[in-house]
Amino acid sequence: MRFDILTLFPEFFTSPLQTSLLGKALANEVAEVHLTNPRDFTTDKHHRVDDEVYGGGVGMLMKPEPIFAAVESLPCLPRRQIVLFTPQGRPMDQPLFHELANHYDQLVMICGHYEGVDERVAEHLVTQELSLGDFVLTCGEIPALTLLNGVIRLRPGTVGKVESLKKESFETELLDYPQYTRPAEFRGWQVPSVLRSGNHALIERWRQEQQIQRTRDRRPDLYQKWLKKSDTSDP
C-alpha cells in the first residue's frame, strides 16, 4: 500500500517512520511512504505557499496551486483516496481504518497549516475530509501520522499475531479488559486471582465481564452501540 504525505515539514516524520511498528512495516515493504513538499511546486522566487484570506480575516491560508501541482505529480493507483484533515471532516475511528486498509491501494494525505487551505482544494481535489477530534492542533501532520499508524498496522504482515488485532479496544465496540504482568503483588495490589487460576473458561468470562463493565462506565456511547449490535445479532 502506498502513502503519499504532502507536508511543509517532512522532517516531522523522520523519527516515526524509522522506529517501532512503522519502521518495521516499511523495512519489510508492507507499505511505502513518500513525503512531498508543496513548496517544491511553487513558481515564485520566494517559494510562497500561503496568502491572505479573501474578505479579510486573521491569519494566512495555504494556496491551491502548489497543492494541486504536488498531488498531480504523484502516481495514481487504481484505488486512491485523497485526504484533507479539517475540523469539519469525518471523525477518525477504527471502522475507518479498516475501510482504508482493506479497500484502497493509495492514500494521499494533505497536511494543512496556518488557517487551513483554500476551499477549492476540498471542493475539487480531495475525496475525503477527516478529523482527529473536536480540538485544534497546530498542523495536519499529527492526524496524518495517526492515520498512517492506524491503517498500516491493519495491513497483512505488520502485526505478528493477527489474532491480537481482533481482541483490541473498538474492534467489537467494547474497550479492552484490564491486563497484568509480574509481579503478582506490587505494593499490596494483587493481580486478580482468576487470572492466576489457569482456568481458561473462567478467565475468558472475567475478561468479557470487565470489557462490558469498563465500556459501560467509561464510554456509554460505545456501550449503547454494542447493545444495539448484540440485539441485531441475536437469532
Curated annotation (Swiss-Prot):
The answer to whether the entry has keyword NADP is no
Q: What is its main location?
A: cytoplasm
Which reactions appear under catalytic activity for this entry? guanosine(37) in tRNA + S-adenosyl-L-methionine = N(1)-methylguanosine(37) in tRNA + S-adenosyl-L-homocysteine + H(+)
What CDD domains does UniProt report for this protein, alphabetically?
Answer: TrmD-like
Q: Where in the cell is it found?
A: Cytoplasm
Q: Which Pfam families match?
A: tRNA_m1G_MT
Domain of life, per lineage: Bacteria
> Where on this chain does S-adenosyl-L-methionine bind?
G112, L132, G133, D134, F135, V136, L137
Task of the protein: Specifically methylates guanosine-37 in various tRNAs.
Tell me the protein's name.
tRNA (guanine-N(1)-)-methyltransferase
Q: Per the UniProt entry, what species is this protein from, by scientific name?
A: Acaryochloris marina (strain MBIC 11017)
